[in-house]
Every structure is written in structure tokens, then in C-alpha cells.
Amino acid sequence: MALTWTIIWWCLLLVILVNEIAAIYTVFREKRDIAATWAWLLVLTLIPGFGFILYAFFGRKLPHKQLARIKSQTQLKLKQALERQKQQFINMPKPKDQTVQIYRRTVMLFQSIDDSFLTRHNAVNIFTNGNALFKKIFDDIAAAKKSIHIEFYTIYNDQIGNELRTLLEQKAAEGVEVRVLYDSWGSMGVWPSFYDHLREVGGYAAPFLMSQSNFFDFRINYRDHRKIVVIDGEIGYVGGFNVGDQYLGRVPKFGPWRDTHLRIVGGGVYGLQRRFIGDWNASM
């Protein structure tokens, strides 16, 4: 009996030792800030086995090459234009109107902390109802002449999702450039084959930052929560609505859905187009 307990204790110690070694290797093989390093080390140490499951979902970072590709695409044709605009505001005479001075400081703040640039001559419509929003999006898509770029976290295989796909297939068949970027986690349950006919008629569809062979990825971080539509480089949509019947109040358990989305015509569309192109190129 004593020998049995001795074997059990040795096996337990071996498991703990292996878990500790695996935890240290897992955490320190990726560069991260000190707080995150120690937090994950504690999780993996104090919750053997299950801690690694949590890490698979929440802790893994993207490969360095992929992060570098995202960063390079984010700066796509932006730095020079942003620097010119910064200099314009720095050299601008100080306005006498205090309100204008406050706006000037706000613009310069956004330019400095987030590389955001000021755009002008924008006409903006606000939508808080999904039915009105998608009717307008569909009307603009139907009138597209050159390109349709769509990026959503969620595109469901339901009534509104199929209506959108059918319309995109029609436009692609007409020769319009159609590109769809979706998040594989947010659109879980929608197989890549959902877009097969769109591809057959000349359109493109791809999951964000993943190849088709990696459709299932347990990584919950580094997801694409953007909801962007850019049509002909002239009309842009951005906001909170995803593509799904629940966002139109058609699913009883969700009830009426309230969110906010913008339709933009003007200089601001350039920012949406740049964001889409950067995400698309980084995902290829």
C-alpha cells in the first residue's frame, strides 16, 4: 500500500514538473508585457491542463510576420499624407475664436495618438434601424459601377445574409469588383463554401487574417470587429450593425435591435477604403 502511494506521489510530482516546464516555455516564447507574462504564468501554473485551454483561446499572439504585415498595411500610403496635414495645423496661425482653437487642438491630438487624419466635405446619414440601413446599402450596391468592398465581423447564412450574397453575385457577374472580408469566429457556422458561387462569377471572399485551411482557429483575440462597406470608393458605411436577421428584429429571442450605423459620402470614405485594403492585403 505504501509503495502504491509513493508511486502516486512521484507521478503527481512529475505531472506538476512537466506542467511547470510547459508553462514557462509557453509564456516566455512570445514577447509580451510583464503584467501579461506573470498573469498567464500564474494561470498555467495554478490551473494545470485547463489553463492551457484558456491560453489557446485568449493568450496566443499572432506570428511576428503576420503582425508586421498588419502594421505595414495599416500605414499604407498614410504617413506622408499625415505628416503634411500635421505640418499644416502646426503652421496654421492661432485662431482668435476659442471654439475653433479647441477643434484645432482636438484634431492635432487625434493625429498624434492614433494617426487619424482630418477629412472634409462629408455628407453623413445616421441609421439606427437595420431594415432602413440594409435597404439603403442594397440600393447603393445595386447602383455600383466599379467596386464593392465589404468587411463584417458577422455575416450569417440567413435571409439577409443570402440576400446580400445574391446581390453581390449579380454585381460580380456584371464585372464589378466584389471583395468580401469576414471574421471566421464571428461568422461561425458559415462555411467557406457559402461564397463558392460568388468566386465562380468573379468575386472574392476571404476570412480575416487566416487561410481557408485554418477556418477553425481557437484564438478569440485578434478578431475583426469592423463593419465596413465601401462602394466605388465614393460611398462608405461604418457602424455597429452586422449582417444577420437578428439585427433586423427578425429573431424573436433578440427582440427589436437598436444600433447605430453611418453612411458617408465625402473625404471620410478614403479612411474606410484604406482600412479595408489594409485588412484585405494583410489577410492574403
Q: Regions from the language model: what does each represent?
A:
Residues 1-284:
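N-terminal localization/anchoring segments of enzymes in phospholipid and broader phosphate metabolism
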